[in-house]
A protein has these predicted regions:
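Alpha-helical transmembrane segments of multi-pass membrane transporters
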Residues: 146-171, 181-194, 208-225, 241-251
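Alpha-helical transmembrane segments of polytopic membrane transporters and translocases
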Residues: 6, 21-23, 35-52, 82-87, ...
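Membrane-proximal transmembrane or re-entrant/amphipathic helices at the cytosolic face
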Residues: 222-270
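Helix-loop junctions and terminal segments of transmembrane helices
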Residues: 40-82, 135-140
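Interfacial segments at transmembrane-helix termini and the short loops linking adjacent helices
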Residues: 79, 96-126, 132
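Interhelical loop/hinge segments that connect adjacent transmembrane helices in multipass membrane
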Residues: 1-19, 57, 61-76, 196-210, ...
Length: 270
């Protein structure tokens, strides 16, 4: 009951964190600003689907390893998951940041005004993803109360900064609060997993995912923007360029990126 109740409350807190900044922006800056910020919010949170997928795929394997005190196996699964999360999520967030004006323009006229704040939240989301499935490790190791305390700390930061910064900085105040809350949660969970649970990934082990996940999308985006600028055609060319190139890179370095181990964990689960 203690585990389930803490997890249930943490889920409620997560939901509040998703909407608190949108509500504050709407209250202080009006419905139009709230709509723009809400569009950015929804776009960025699509990336969390990658993390949730990783949690579902590898969670049971990590739980089994921890239950049998196979810390090395749990670490191997965590490392491969972290590499894959980084390799898949970083291109998504970089795409949002580089082509924010065009992508937000699909929501309607004026929404491109929110493109600038993507350069605040997307790097924060990338850092959070590079920490890997720390939330999953906390849950699978039975530390749901730790996770709840992390979420509550994040909520305090979000509420405090939103009410302090939104009246002064507008949308940038809200996104600063969001990024700060996200990084606080990530830092606390990472510290607990690295220091207290004993599972961590080194910078050397993460280097291939970090480099390739940043370099390939950036080069493709800059090439498209240089020739076509911010346009729908530019986005199309970027996607047509990125998908085969990055797909080939992922396949070529599938072992170094942990993709094979990640897929083997999925097969073991099924």
């Amino acid at each position: 009951w203690g585990f389930s109740s803490a997890r249930g409350v943490a889920t409620i807190v997560e939901t509040i964190l998703e909407w608190i900044d949108v509500l504050v922006v709407t209250e202080f800056l009006g419905a139009a600003a709230g709509g723009i910020y809400g569009a950015v919010n929804r776009c960025v949170r699509v990336g969390t689907m990658i993390e949730h997928t990783g949690r579902v795929v590898t969670g049971p394997s990590i739980s089994a390893a921890l239950a049998t005190r196979q810390l090395d196996r749990a670490r191997d699964i965590f490392l491969s998951t972290t590499r894959v999360l980084t390799a898949l999520s970083w291109p998504f967030y970089l795409s949002l940041a580089f082509f924010g004006p065009t992508l937000l323009g699909f929501f309607g006229k004026g929404f491109e005004a929110g493109a600038g704040i993507l350069w605040v939240i997307c790097p924060a989301a990338m850092l959070s993803m590079s920490a890997g499935g720390v939330q999953s490790v906390l849950l699978m190791s039975g530390k749901s109360r730790w996770q709840l305390l992390n979420k509550l700390s994040s909520l305090v930061v979000a509420v405090t900064l939103n009410f302090t910064l939104v009246p002064v900085w507008g949308l940038y105040g809200a996104v600063t609060a969001w990024a700060s809350a996200l990084l606080i949660d990530t830092f606390l969970a990472s510290y607990q997993v690295f220091r207290l649970v004993g599972i961590r990934a080194s910078a050397r082990e993460m280097a291939p995912s970090l480099f390739l996940g940043a370099a390939v999308p950036t080069v493709c985006a800059l090439a498209s923007l240089a020739f076509l600028g911010q346009s729908v055609l530019g986005v199309i060319v970027y996607v047509v360029l990125l998908v085969p190139v990055y797909g080939a890179v992922l396949y070529r370095f599938r072992k170094a990126l942990g993709i094979e181990r990640f897929l083997s964990a999925r097969r073991a689960k099924s």
